[in-house]
Amino acid sequence: MKYLVYVALAFVLWFIMFVLKPVNFWISMAFSTSLLSVISFVNYREQLKVSVSMVKEILIGIGSALLLYGVFWLGKFILDNIGIIPNHNAGISNVYANKGLFPPWLIGIMLFFPIGFGEEFFWRGYLQRHLSSKYGNLKSFLITVFFYTAVHIPTLNPVLILAAFLVGMFWGALFIWRKNNIVAPLVSHMVWDPMIFIIFPLN
């Protein structure tokens, strides 16, 4: 049950980052995701071996990032016109509130690596992979989505919590589709983060 210790650590790190905020958010996020990357690497270092299908997986990752951005653009349109979540624009603004803490170019780089890399490498690359060997694809998928969503609940931001649930479902399903190959979800997360936060923000 060692994985539960790592999940508990992620809960603590996310609570510190999003709620306590003792230091600059981006420094805290970079440290947290780097730490989770090290944990994931120690447990599943064979994931980083280059395979002959690497280029294909990278292209799928880039394409899926574009698809996910389109889903969120459509979601923003629905929220604006149907109003499923009251005061959703306040929630979106809160997500982008940390944008002024560093220059945009630096935030974009950090979102690509280590943040996007570290998040995906831990949640899908380590946790979902580890659970799939014990419980199979479906249970590991559902448990990972639950934990990934739950670490965002202390923010009390319904937009962020819903977003975490959706991307957790998306990247978890992509991981299963690619037969537990982490490359496509990894690239997808690394590309999508700076795209939606810096390059083409939805606020």
What is each model feature region?
Residues 119-143, 173-181:
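Membrane-interface helix/loop boundary segments of multi-pass membrane proteins
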